[in-house]
């Protein structure tokens, strides 16, 4: 067993990407309305993302990367892992 595999975090639960999105914008001092403005997405869409009613698409992930500085791959992986966990 390698040190990496010994200490790798593998939770048995999934956190909705919207929770992480809200935590991220909170930490940056950005409101949902400001995020909507900066991404060019309707506020309704941002609210749906945060509330887990809408999925983070590849396009949305790129917009979040541009505005928040968090790589699109992070958002894409978070969304994929969450959806996979919900189906298990």
Describe each model-derived feature in a short phrase.
Residues 66-88:
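Short amphipathic recognition helices of helix-turn-helix/homeodomain-type DNA-binding modules
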Residues 2-30:
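A short, Lys/Arg-rich alpha-helix, primarily the initiator
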Residues 27, 38, 67:
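Residues within the alpha-helical elements of helix-turn-helix
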Residues 33, 44, 73:
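Key DNA-contact positions within bacterial/archaeal DNA-binding proteins
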Residues 22, 33, 62:
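Residues within the helices of the helix-turn-helix
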């Amino acid at each position: 067993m390698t040190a990496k595999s010994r200490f790798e975090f593998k939770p048995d639960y999934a956190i909705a990407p919207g929770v992480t999105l809200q935590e991220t914008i909170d930490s940056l001092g950005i409101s949902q309305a400001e995020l909507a403005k900066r991404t060019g997405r309707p506020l309704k869409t941002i609210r749906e993302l945060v509330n887990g009613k809408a999925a983070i698409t590849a396009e949305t992930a790129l917009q979040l990367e541009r505005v928040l500085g968090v790589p699109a791959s992070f958002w894409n992986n978070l969304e994929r892992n969450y959806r996979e966990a919900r189906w298990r």
